[in-house]
Amino acid sequence: MAQFFKAKPNSSKQLSAKLSLSVNQLDHLGAGIAQHQGKVVFIPGALPDETVTVQLTEQKKNYARAKLIKVDTPSSERVAPECPHYHTCGGCDLQHMSLSGQREHKEAALLDIMAKFAGAEGGTLSPALTGEGWHYRRRARLATLFDKNTKHLSLGFRAASSSNVVPISQCQVLAKPLSDLIVPFAKLLNQLSAKASLGHLELIAADNGHFAVLRITKALNDKDLAKLSAFAEQHQIHICLQDNEGQFQGVGAELVLPVYQLLDDKAESDAVSLSFTPGNFVQVNGQINKAMVAQAMDWLAPAPDERILDLFCGMGNFSLPLAKMGADVIGVEGVAEMVTQARVNAKANNLDKLTFYHGDLSADLSLEPWMGKIDKLLLDPARAGAFESLQWLKKMKPRKVVYVSCNPASLARDSAVLLERGYRLQQLGLIDMFPQTHHIEAMALFELTK
């Protein structure tokens, strides 16, 4: 009878054993990398040049994962995390590393990915777009968890790789006025009779005030509405409710939309503002978003009457400033609600050289009314990237392409397409949109050479 080899499962003895390892680098997700018995070992929380005591948690053929038990020899980049919830909340994962160290790591990781997967080693490395390391988030969504036994509602963030809600009293990366509202909101929500029917709470800091969006699964009674209204007045915040159908209703007043300015240091006549409904996507780091928009304008250098295509345009984060500078701009977005809001924003900013379309940018674009020769192209896709859209470069033939990316892996893949089509990487720069986390965003400029 034939006998087949069956790999033995990880023994409890193997996994419970404690090891002393030397960490030599970070992976792209911010975990320390060490070597043990010919395998790569990933250690969240460990830093390069550290000697650490770890416990293996997972063994695979070519790699292992381990839990950090103790830092025996700390790195010069190691710092004490500022947030008391750091080791339980799933939001941040690099607070134990200096801000300068984080940025150096992210920049090196970006260059490594681009060289390895795109073969893109040319071009000029632009200075990273950086800002405040703490209290930079102007928007956050807090989860709620109602305990049927204690009748208590917890308000916080979800733990890493878990649906468990970690109650928090503050958030060191959330705008300070919003962070200061967490405890008062938790107290308020526990006073509502409908607390078992409450969903997430979203907090927003905008240029025209502070906002809170409370998700509800059933209508609130008058007493609960009165409590919310009194809270809004006391804390000078706009509160709105979002029902099961996704509709929004203001509490104690008409619904007010948050507004952001997109460009800094502009005279009133040159200002560009963007309003949005609470359900729309916006960049959470306002300081970096302004710098990012300014850099995109500088790299694209839009001239009057140039035809510029903005794919994955959202509500006009880049389209509006491009049109303000005199270009004929076409914005295309896959989410219909955001296209509607983009048109509202164009009208509010008195921009008439701007047209928005709704469309699936992963589909056949050959018959789209906007498809054709353009002067310049801006791309700001989601994490999946813009691979399908770039297949139509021959029809568009832009002289310049600015690619704004929230995923270096898809940026590298798509950069390879651009390089194959005769474009050269001219500029590449890190965008540190999310300090204290491993997340890497970037901007790249390509120019047609043939």
Swiss-Prot record:
The source's domain of life comes to: Bacteria
Q: Which residues bind [4Fe-4S] cluster?
A: 83, 89, 92, 171
* Enzyme type, top EC level: transferase
Q: Which UniProt keywords apply?
A: 4Fe-4S, Iron, Iron-sulfur, Metal-binding, Methyltransferase, rRNA processing, S-adenosyl-L-methionine, Transferase
Gene name linked to the record: rlmD
Any idea what job this protein has?
A: Catalyzes the formation of 5-methyl-uridine at position 1939 (m5U1939) in 23S rRNA.
Instruction: Identify the species of origin.
Output: Shewanella baltica (strain OS223)
* EC numbers for this chain: 2.1.1.190
Write down the NCBIfam families for this protein, in alphabetical order. Answer: PRK13168.1, rumA
Q: Which reaction does it catalyse?
A: uridine(1939) in 23S rRNA + S-adenosyl-L-methionine = 5-methyluridine(1939) in 23S rRNA + S-adenosyl-L-homocysteine + H(+)
The name this protein goes by in its record: 23S rRNA (uracil(1939)-C(5))-methyltransferase RlmD
Residues at the active site: 406 (nucleophile)
Give the HAMAP family listed for this entry.
Answer: 23SrRNA_methyltr_RlmD
Q: Which residues form the TRAM domain?
A: 12-70
Q: Which residues bind S-adenosyl-L-methionine?
A: 283, 312, 317, 333, 360, 380
Q: Please verify whether the record's keywords include 4Fe-4S.
A: yes
One MF term in the entry's GO annotations: iron ion binding
User: What does the similarity note say?
Assistant: Belongs to the class I-like SAM-binding methyltransferase superfamily. RNA M5U methyltransferase family. RlmD subfamily.
GO annotation, biological process: rRNA base methylation
